[in-house]
Structure formats: structure tokens, C-alpha cells
Amino acid sequence: VEKLSGEVVAVESVPGRFESLDEGQEFAVFVDYAHTPDALDNVLKTARSLTNGKLICVFGCGGDRDRGKRPEMGRAAGKWADLLWVTSDNPRSEDPDSIIKDIVKAVPANVVCATDANRASAIEAALHGASPGDCVVIAGKGHEVEQELNDRVIPFDDRLVARAVLQ
């Protein structure tokens, strides 16, 4: 260990994998690519262990994909988070509100759950609702820099949206 400690200068994190965003705010913010129930469960379990405050999670599910995982995502998020912002991910040709309803129906009743199909405004609301000591996890897109909406692909990066709100 002593030999290695002198050799390791810095370890870069993988972009979009539990990536910390620090703009001087008094709460933690992480962006993660978690887009499966198991991945979301693991990320939120880790985030829960790092905060004594509220755990707030922003997430959605892709459209034109496995509809069966949507309720599982709602259950996984509700297992750890105090507040959920369920939003769009890459809705593709599906109605974002329909996807959101599929997720929300499985969120435990004791979890506060808000919805907003506009991902940018859901991220903004989650960040504005955070207090010192809280933790906000923005999940599902991670390193992605685009969002698929109907017949178009638009530039969209959770990290840039969050940083703009935090500055």
C-alpha cells in the first residue's frame, strides 16, 4: 500500500456514474446513468448512506422500451427516496405523461411524488426544493447529451441543466 500510495495521483470518475456536481451548494447533487430498477436501487441506497437529510430523486423511463420495468423503477426509487420527481427520459414516440403514470402507480404511498414531463423543469424544481444536508440524485441519462422526443433528437445534458440552476 505504501508503494502504491505514492504512485496514485488522482482517480478520475466515470462521467455520468454517480458524478458529483459541486457549484458551492449546501447539499449534494449526483448524476447517474441508472436506468434499470437494480441500478436505481443501488445508486439510491448509496446516496441514502451519504445523507442525513432528505433524499430527492429525479428520474424517468424511456419510451418504446420495456414497459414492465416502469413500475419496478417506481418501487426502487420509493424504497430509498423521500421525494421523487418523475419526469421524461427519452420518451421517443410515446406520450411522456403515459410513461410517468406507469411509474407513479407503483410508488409507495408514503413517498412524496411529484411529476413534470419537462425534464429540465423537474431538475430545477428538485434542486430548488433541496435544503442544506439533502442529497439530489438525477438518474437515468447520466453521460447522455441528447434527448429523444418523437421524431427529433434535441441537445440535453442533465449535468449542464443542473449546473445552470445551481450557479
Regions of interest found by a model, annotated:
Residues 1-167:
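ATP-dependent carboxylate-amine ligase
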